[in-house]
Regions:
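Charged, heptad-repeat coiled-coil alpha-helices that serve as long linker/dimerization "arms"
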Residues: 1-80
Length: 80
């Protein structure tokens, strides 16, 4: 039972690290899309702006999901 708890603890800690890395990648991707968005805004490319806005919205949703997963993992980790 104790070994099970230790394994679970290690697994959750790894998951937190993985989630942090995933969040960082998504944030970097969002930064790139924001740059494209600004360029499209300068060119007044409405179609491109709409497409990029949709991409930004999707990235924001991914970020929220990852933060939620991170919080749930932290809570489980603290309960062990």
């Amino acid at each position: 039972e104790q070994k099970k708890a230790k394994n679970r603890l290690a697994s959750l800690e790894k998951k937190l690290v993985r989630l942090e890395e995933e969040l960082q990648k998504i944030e970097e991707e969002k930064e790139e899309v924001n740059k494209k968005y600004l360029l499209a805004g300068e060119k007044n490319d409405v179609d491109k702006l709409m497409s990029l806005q949709e991409e930004l919205d999707n990235l924001d949703n991914k970020i929220l999901e990852k933060y939620q997963e991170y919080e749930e993992t932290e809570i489980e980790l603290k309960s062990l």
